[in-house]
């Protein structure tokens, strides 16, 4: 007798072992038809999986997130099937699920073209319509490796050799195609109805640039056409908002081959940067942080003591001078510990909060670089809090409050919080981890925040809170972190004198709100589609004269506004006013101030807000008051 416990708490009993599909059919024909897989005692399995013991089972359909993953994974295999039918000489490698879709890497003797993608997608649709059953079988390692070698699939054979001896080797087949996979997969290809191939990109075998270059075909798959249409529309909108395009259009920054991964900031872009940095500086100063500055280049011995030289060297830029090895700092933490150590610290000095807009460099692979989002040289709004164990919850509460307020000011209302918990390999005792993890939970609870827990995802030196902001397109970006560190103070010898005159290690909290300034500015540009709120905009207003006769008044007006702290420019060019208005509208300036003879004579301005909104004619004082009202909440 086999007892199956369902999600609603009910128990069904079967006299013999049953498959997931049979359980679904016993519940109802509709569920049997909709079933894509099952979750057996928490593990995803195929509908063909036989259950021969008492277990908990949930039937997975396309209404479940796991169901969508199964569809995407199966569609990746459908892609490989179609490629092998159309291009038999192509070799298949791997095809995982990624955010919003999947990819599959191929080795082929020529580049795939857009026309190839159209043919492949059409063949995928044809195979899906055949509704071919997908079957799974478990085989020996030798049988699997021998099979793939016999059909010339050397990459699959290599993957099999790297699979742990304790793992099962599963082969999935549909039609004439067999692939190696952990699964699970849909029961038949007819379940795959909504998909689209997106693009081809280069990729290295096993992600190593020393290996062969492959071709990666990206695709997306969904349960409903409306969802795919919505996703494709979002991609179109994202293309319009691409910070690289807007950076050029708005004359904010550029990048060039002579300095890969580094940014050349133009005056308008640097003005935007300064607004963000000055705002962040105000906020951390008000929160009791002390701003410091640490060296960009430090001796190898410090990086060895911190552990970075042994564990992070391949990502560090190094140099040598007078027979000494140095590294350009990839992060600020070791330098902040040096400041803390400089002098005897007492428990009365704690908490100490050191902040730095620290310039860091990391030797990212050239293929991973992406505009402002992935660079080699960047500035972090970095800070480290040194406190006692009794103080760290209060410090965490204060940081949560500060971070959420900052995100709101920048226009981000939806923040997802994730708490990464202890990994298997870790420093410190279980009791220390218990206190650390519960302390971060208590801090989040005290702030009225909800969070998702990620078991095993913490760093070996402590648990971490991550702050993921959602932009206007619904995309999630991890920006902020609050990382508890149980190791670095010990490694670098940081200590303070406790109340009982003993020497103790401080608790160290690494924290950032925006993270990389470059990346955050890229996110901001895309979130606002380049139309920055007035408090951030490089220019808050531009004064435009209609004819030469108003040039003197327009110039005087510009100077008056500048003296009142308005970021304003004057456009006195001898061009048609319609041309000038259009140009500055495309530059997304918040306010255009137009002056003609009437405005000059009455000492007024005609105000146009962004979006072509006509605010009418008003005295300059009234405009300044309106602008100040816009800015008041950020002063």
From Swiss-Prot:
<keyword id="KW-0694">RNA-binding</keyword>
<feature type="region of interest" description="Catalytic">
    <location>
        <begin position="242"/>
        <end position="533"/>
    </location>
</feature>
<dbReference type="InterPro" id="IPR012947">
    <property type="entry name" value="tRNA_SAD"/>
</dbReference>
<dbReference type="InterPro" id="IPR006195">
    <property type="entry name" value="aa-tRNA-synth_II"/>
</dbReference>
<dbReference type="Pfam" id="PF00587">
    <property type="entry name" value="tRNA-synt_2b"/>
</dbReference>
<dbReference type="Pfam" id="PF02824">
    <property type="entry name" value="TGS"/>
</dbReference>
<dbReference type="GO" id="GO:0046872">
    <property type="term" value="F:metal ion binding"/>
</dbReference>
<dbReference type="InterPro" id="IPR004154">
    <property type="entry name" value="Anticodon-bd"/>
</dbReference>
<dbReference type="InterPro" id="IPR012676">
    <property type="entry name" value="TGS-like"/>
</dbReference>
<dbReference type="InterPro" id="IPR012675">
    <property type="entry name" value="Beta-grasp_dom_sf"/>
</dbReference>
<keyword id="KW-0436">Ligase</keyword>
<dbReference type="InterPro" id="IPR002314">
    <property type="entry name" value="aa-tRNA-synt_IIb"/>
</dbReference>
<dbReference type="InterPro" id="IPR018163">
    <property type="entry name" value="Thr/Ala-tRNA-synth_IIc_edit"/>
</dbReference>
<keyword id="KW-0067">ATP-binding</keyword>
<keyword id="KW-0648">Protein biosynthesis</keyword>
<dbReference type="GO" id="GO:0005829">
    <property type="term" value="C:cytosol"/>
</dbReference>
<dbReference type="Pfam" id="PF03129">
    <property type="entry name" value="HGTP_anticodon"/>
</dbReference>
<comment type="subunit">
    <text>Homodimer.</text>
</comment>
<dbReference type="InterPro" id="IPR004095">
    <property type="entry name" value="TGS"/>
</dbReference>
<feature type="binding site">
    <location>
        <position position="510"/>
    </location>
    <ligand>
        <name>Zn(2+)</name>
    </ligand>
</feature>
<dbReference type="InterPro" id="IPR047246">
    <property type="entry name" value="ThrRS_anticodon"/>
</dbReference>
<dbReference type="InterPro" id="IPR045864">
    <property type="entry name" value="aa-tRNA-synth_II/BPL/LPL"/>
</dbReference>
<keyword id="KW-0820">tRNA-binding</keyword>
<dbReference type="InterPro" id="IPR033728">
    <property type="entry name" value="ThrRS_core"/>
</dbReference>
<dbReference type="GO" id="GO:0005524">
    <property type="term" value="F:ATP binding"/>
</dbReference>
<keyword id="KW-0030">Aminoacyl-tRNA synthetase</keyword>
<keyword id="KW-0547">Nucleotide-binding</keyword>
<dbReference type="GO" id="GO:0006435">
    <property type="term" value="P:threonyl-tRNA aminoacylation"/>
</dbReference>
<feature type="binding site">
    <location>
        <position position="333"/>
    </location>
    <ligand>
        <name>Zn(2+)</name>
    </ligand>
</feature>
<feature type="domain" description="TGS">
    <location>
        <begin position="1"/>
        <end position="61"/>
    </location>
</feature>
<protein>
    <recommendedName>
        <fullName>Threonine--tRNA ligase</fullName>
        <ecNumber>6.1.1.3</ecNumber>
    </recommendedName>
</protein>
<comment type="function">
    <text>Catalyzes the attachment of threonine to tRNA(Thr) in a two-step reaction: L-threonine is first activated by ATP to form Thr-AMP and then transferred to the acceptor end of tRNA(Thr). Also edits incorrectly charged L-seryl-tRNA(Thr).</text>
</comment>
<dbReference type="Pfam" id="PF07973">
    <property type="entry name" value="tRNA_SAD"/>
</dbReference>
<dbReference type="InterPro" id="IPR036621">
    <property type="entry name" value="Anticodon-bd_dom_sf"/>
</dbReference>
<dbReference type="GO" id="GO:0000049">
    <property type="term" value="F:tRNA binding"/>
</dbReference>
<comment type="similarity">
    <text>Belongs to the class-II aminoacyl-tRNA synthetase family.</text>
</comment>
<keyword id="KW-0963">Cytoplasm</keyword>
<dbReference type="GO" id="GO:0004829">
    <property type="term" value="F:threonine-tRNA ligase activity"/>
</dbReference>
<dbReference type="InterPro" id="IPR002320">
    <property type="entry name" value="Thr-tRNA-ligase_IIa"/>
</dbReference>
<keyword id="KW-0479">Metal-binding</keyword>
<keyword id="KW-0862">Zinc</keyword>
<feature type="binding site">
    <location>
        <position position="384"/>
    </location>
    <ligand>
        <name>Zn(2+)</name>
    </ligand>
</feature>
């Amino acid at each position: 007798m086999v007892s199956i416990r369902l999600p609603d708490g009910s128990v069904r009993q079967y006299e013999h072992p049953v498959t997931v599909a049979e359980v679904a059919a016993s519940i109802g024909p509709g569920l049997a038809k909709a079933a894509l897989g099952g979750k057996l005692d928490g593990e995803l399995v195929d509908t063909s999986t036989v259950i021969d013991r008492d277990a908990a089972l949930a039937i997975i359909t396309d209404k479940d997130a796991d169901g969508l993953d199964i569809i995407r994974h199966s569609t990746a295999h459908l892609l490989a099937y179609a490629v092998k039918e159309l291009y038999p000489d192509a070799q298949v490698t791997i095809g995982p699920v990624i955010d919003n879709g999947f990819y599959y890497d191929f080795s082929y003797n020529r580049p795939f073209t857009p026309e190839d993608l159209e043919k492949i997608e059409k063949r995928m649709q044809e195979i899906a319509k055949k509704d071919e059953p997908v079957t799974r079988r478990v085989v020996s390692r030798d049988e699997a490796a021998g099979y793939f070698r016999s059909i010339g699939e050397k990459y699959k054979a290599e993957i099999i050799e790297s699979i742990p001896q304790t793992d099962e080797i599963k082969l999935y087949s549909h039609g004439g195609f067999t692939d190696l996979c952990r699964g699970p997969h849909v029961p038949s290809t007819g379940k795959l109805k909504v998909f689209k191939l997106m693009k081809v990109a280069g990729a290295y075998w096993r992600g190593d640039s020393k290996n062969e270059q492959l071709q990666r075909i990206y695709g997306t798959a969904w349960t409903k056409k409306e969802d795919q249409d919505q996703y494709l529309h979002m991609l179109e909108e994202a293309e319009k908002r691409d910070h690289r395009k807007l950076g050029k259009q708005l004359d904010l920054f550029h990048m060039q081959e002579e300095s890969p991964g580094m940014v050349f900031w133009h005056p308008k872009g640097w003005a935007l940067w300064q607004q963000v940095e000055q705002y962040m500086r105000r906020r951390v100063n008000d929160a009791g942080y002390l701003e410091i500055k640490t060296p960009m280049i430090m001796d190898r011995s410090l990086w060895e003591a911190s552990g970075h030289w042994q564990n992070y060297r391949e990502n560090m830029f190094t140099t040598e001078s007078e027979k000494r090895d140095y590294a350009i700092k990839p992060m600020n933490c070791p330098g902040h510990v040096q400041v803390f150590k400089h002098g005897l610290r007492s428990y009365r000095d704690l908490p100490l909060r050191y902040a730095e807009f620290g310039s860091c460099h990391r030797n990212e692979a050239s293929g991973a670089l992406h505009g402002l989002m992935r660079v080699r040289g960047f500035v972090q709004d970095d800070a480290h809090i040194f406190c006692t164990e009794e103080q760290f919850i209060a410090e965490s509460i204060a940081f949560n409050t500060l971070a959420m307020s900052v995100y709101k000011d920048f226009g981000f209302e939806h923040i997802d919080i994730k708490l990464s918990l202890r990994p298997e390999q870790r420093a410190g005792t279980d009791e220390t981890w218990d206190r650390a993890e519960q302390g971060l939970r208590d801090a989040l609870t005290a702030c009225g925040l909800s969070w998702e827990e990620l078991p095993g995802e913490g760093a070996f030196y402590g648990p971490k809170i991550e702050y993921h902001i959602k932009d206007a397109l619904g995309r999630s970006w991890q920006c902020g972190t609050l990382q508890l560190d149980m190791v670095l103070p010990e490694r670098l010898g940081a200590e303070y004198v406790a109340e009982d005159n003993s020497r103790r290690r401080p608790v160290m909290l690494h924290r950032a709100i925006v993270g990389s300034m470059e990346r955050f500015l890229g996110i901001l540009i895309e979130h606002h589609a380049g139309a920055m709120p007035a408090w951030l905009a490089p220019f808050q207003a531009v004064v435009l004269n209609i004819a030469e006769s108003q040039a003197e008044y327009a110039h005087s007006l510009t100077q008056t506004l500048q003296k009142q702290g308005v970021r304003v420019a004057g456009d006195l060019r001898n061009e048609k006013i319609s041309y000038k208005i259009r140009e500055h509208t495309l530059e997304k300036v918040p306010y255009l101030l137009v002056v003609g003879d009437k405005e000059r004579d009455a000492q007024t301005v005609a105000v146009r807000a962004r979006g072509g909104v006509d605010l009418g004619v008003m005295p300059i004082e009234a405009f300044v008051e309106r602008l100040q009202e816009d800015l008041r909440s950020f002063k």
